[in-house]
Amino acid sequence: MSSLTRRDFVRSAALAALATQLPRAVSAANIPTTAANATPEASGAVGPTVRWLDGAPPAVQSGVTWGMPWPRGKNTKQTTFSLRDGATEIPVQSWPLAFWPDGSLKWTAHAVPAGQVPAADSLVEAGTPRAPATPLVVRETGDSIEVDTGVIVARLARAGAVIVTSVRRGEQEILRGGRLVALRQGTPDTAAEPELQAGEIATVTVEQPGPVRAVVKIEGRHASATDGRRWLPFVVRLYFYAGGEAIRVMHTFVHDGDERKESIRGIGLRFDVPLRGELHDRHIRFSGEGNGLFGEAVRTVTGLRRDAGAAVRAAQIAGEATPPVASWDPRAGKRMHLVPAFADWSLFQSSADGFEIRKRTAEGCSWLTAARGQRAGGLGYVGTPKGGVAFGVRNFWQSYPGELAIAGATSDVAGVTAWLWSPRSGAMDLRGYRDGAEMGTYAEQLEGLEITYEDYEPGFDRPEGVARTSELFIWALAATPSRAHLAQLAEVVRTPPVVVTTPEYLHSCDVFGGLWAPADRSNSARAAIEDRLDWAFRFYEGQREERRWYGFWNFGDVMHTYDADRHEWRYDVGGFAWDNSELSTDIWLWLHFLRTGRAEVFRFAEAMTRHTGEVDVHHLGRFAPLGSRHNVLHWGCSAKQLRISTATNRRYYYYLTGDERVGDLLHEQVEAVRALATVQANRKVAPDRVTAPDPNAKEVYAGFGTDWGSAAAAWLTEWERTGDPKMRDRLLASMRTIGAQPRGFFTGGGRLELATGAFALAANDRVTVSHLSAVFGLVEVCAELVQLLDEPAFRSAWLDYCTLYNAPAAEQRQRLGEALRGNNLRQAHSRLTAFAARTNGDAALARRAWREFIEGERGDSGLSRPPESRRVNGPDVLRPVDEAAWVSTNGTAQWGLAAIECLALVGESIPEDVR
């Protein structure tokens, strides 16, 4: 089998042929060679090497996947890849993620088996891949799927309520009955006992069958055994690697209930572990903070009045088989049946600052508190010297309230539940935070917007269709591991190993539009900007910790605006609370990672991508697949928008990792613009222009900024991934008709034909401009489109917009017939000026871009204000915090993007003293 084979990529087989049908595609010769798009040879950049994100190789490597970019034209669709660590060939499986317009590979994904640890500077290159010593094998039958990694064999069901029928090592069954569970109850105020529901399989798809990596996708809904109700759709992916004993689980559920009548009391993954041997040889483990580990036996032999012997105690503490009872001191051995054995165990993380471990002997008996701590590592284990299961939930304490529960450890089979939301915390309360009785009319809602910045509307603050994705790990082990090894597994759960390439190589491939370049401190002016970029990231990293921006529905997001009087972010004030990707926070973080390669930046951006792509977007229901504007509740605003769900925010993570769930989210946005026919943004401010919602509409009004920019990002990504000519044609039609408008981008928007992507031409030459049009990813997607598709009128229209938005009023009047009004965020738009300067080779325009960037609009926007915070202590605040009252997330994200892109585009023109 070719190393590039992948079932869901079969339809891309015709891509090379399609490339010949792109007469308007830009050729390499038509692209000016700049620092942003030079080849590796021209720039002296390093080749396609890989490195471990955290620097050092991991102690445990259970299988890893990463993405690699390639220069245009370097590798064909038929290219296979090898991975070489010096003279050593490492087994690797490869597949395509995206293609350049000429059909050559733009991004590929690569996977290596468990136990293989490529050294830094290992080289990915064209060649015949080495096969794994024991290739992973997937066997499919009518009712099951079997995945054999060479170490474990997992049998998966195609129907029913059990997903993982069994996992075996050799002849021994280690795990059985893997299933999804949910608890449903009435409103959070209801005292009734919740109903247990099981996840029922609808479809199972083998997305990847090896030989290094297998991916199995399971979809279905949670079902009630009493009334037959099916709710909470789920998508679960199971990942296996050759030579591995682990299963990685990506668990997604979508909320489709009525939060006013019912609520989720718990949701998680449950499985059974057969136990063999004496109760004193059964071991329980939970990870704490750092390398801390709680470890006990179901029945202890330590601390007793009669000592069984030093060898017995040492073996139990180490998790090894104890000597035969007949060899113990008989005063202890003959009385062991009188020592209480503990059947049920629990690690419960109730908040970001506290966890509790407890145990009990049986149902109906009291729980004993065994330990307490602050932030658990999220790993548990139950087993014996003859086999057991380690299991963990990533971001365990950050995503509280979670629980790892073990039941029946005194029986032949222990039950394990990894609660992603623990029932001990009470039910999820997803109801609106206000009744809105005083805001029933549009006029009242607009008045509310004036005071709280909240765009409230009854019925629009519901969580219908919001989703949550969690990452879990399961290890089927031959015996209870040492404490040191369990601490290593806990580290995998906490920070899974990640492989990346270097910023220099990424940059040399000219991906992501050439709008960024590796961090450069070669002179004092550049260093000053780099210092400010680093400070901004560190400040938000610190605020997440100090302000406790954690929790199941919150982790990954940041707050929007600060309240200096309360010394608190405005968590309870309408549109000033959660940020929800406003003004491209995600893009700022990802570009900061691309240019620095720093692990802490990657993981901050990764958490935000998971959150904003799942929680801040409606994946089903009346608002799907639109995102929701910033609000006290992530889904609370009535402004449902493409600019929040935009594929631009997800592209970076997808291409860097090949993550299939994020791939789903990208595909989900392909037809998102159709939602504008039923959720009309201007219904409150221009009710006379609103038409009746029509799900079968053939056209919609779309702005050229946040609307079309988001649609274009989705079409571009789908075209790159699949080669679908319909996506290319939509892009070309929309670009061509934007370029043909009387005022180009300054026309503002138009009627978009949904089938073709073409805009109707405006009947007048009125100038329309919004300061928000270009700050939700439009700059980034247009840079790629100009690079990829040769549409001269579009290119000209975009360069006009970039040049004139911040131009002097006299120049605007000369070119447009009037001076622009409402063109705020001038500092943020300095990067548009820089793009025009670079593209046109205009030195004067480059100098103007730096003036716009440095001066800003207010004194606190430029570098003139030192990036400082002050410590605020009690009794002014609940606990000490660092405060920078002048900081806003909008300003930080846009300043960061302007800094990064101006440095990349016109860095050679930077003034010596940017202060």
Model features per residue range: what roles?
Residues P132-A157, R483-L591, R595, R603, ...:
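An acidic-aromatic substrate-binding cleft motif
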Residues R84-W107, G440-I451:
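Solvent-exposed beta-strand/loop surfaces of large extracellular or lumenal domains
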Residues P481-V492, T717-G744, G748-R915:
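Terminal, non-catalytic domain-edge segments
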Residues S2, D8-A29:
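N-terminal export signals
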Residues D54-K77, I264-D272:
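Surface-exposed beta-strand/loop patches in extracellular or lumenal glycoproteins
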Residues P23-T49:
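C-terminal segment of N-terminal export signals and the immediately downstream linker at the start
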Residues Y540-N580, T612-M727, G739-H771, V775:
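Catalytic cores of eukaryotic secretory-pathway lumenal/extracellular enzymes that build
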Residues H110, S144-T501, F555-T561, A577-N580, ...:
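Beta-strand/loop-rich accessory regions of lumenal/periplasmic or secreted enzymes
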